[in-house]
């Protein structure tokens, strides 16, 4: 028997094989980003770790999203200017990075190190691995993807082959502090 109840052992085993292959792919993706684009990763982390007054003030009205999309008059109307990432992005991306690192470590420990862990440690790693994956999946499904779709310019930047640039105008609207401090406008003649 398996923990999923209604499926056959063969199906459960096949799902576990797929799980391990996808885990290996996620591991290669994350580790590859750090190893093959360390400067890009460092810049991303620098931008995520810079919390100023405006970052904190973003949470007073959650960037105006409740007012704009749900007509809920939450907090002040004014959204303070943000850097490369707004307060919500900084918080969620830091959670994503920590959770992905945790899921990678616990996943490999559960798969390769199971005989060495002992029942209690295995149990708690398993529980936190499962719940961590549920939390990350919920964040991606309920917040990250819907909010990315609200900004088509950013959404197109994600899927564009190459650097994933966005227009100067989109950056000016969403990230004015970052634009003023870090971005050089190139004017083509």
Q: What are these language model-derived features?
A:
Residues 1-189:
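Membrane-embedded alpha-helical bundles that constitute the cytochrome b-like, heme-associated redox core
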């Amino acid at each position: 028997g398996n923990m999923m109840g209604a499926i056959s052992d063969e199906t459960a085993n096949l799902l576990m094989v797929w799980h391990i292959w996808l885990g290996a792919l996620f591991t290669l993706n994350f580790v590859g980003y750090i190893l093959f684009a360390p400067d890009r990763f460092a810049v991303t982390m620098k931008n995520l770790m810079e919390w100023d007054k405006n970052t904190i003030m973003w949470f007073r009205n959650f960037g105006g999203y409740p007012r704009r999309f749900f007509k809920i008059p939450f907090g002040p109307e004014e959204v303070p200017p943000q850097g490369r990432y707004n307060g919500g992005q900084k918080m969620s991306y830091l959670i994503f990075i920590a959770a992905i690192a945790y899921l990678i470590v616990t996943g490999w420990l559960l798969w390769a190190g199971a005989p060495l862990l002992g029942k209690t440690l295995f149990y708690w790693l398993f529980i936190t691995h499962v719940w961590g994956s549920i939390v990350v999946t919920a964040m991606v499904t309920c917040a990250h993807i819907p909010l990315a779709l609200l900004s088509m310019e950013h959404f197109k930047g994600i899927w564009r082959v190459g650097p994933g640039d966005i227009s100067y105008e989109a950056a000016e609207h969403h990230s004015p502090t970052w634009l003023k401090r870090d971005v050089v406008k190139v004017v083509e003649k």
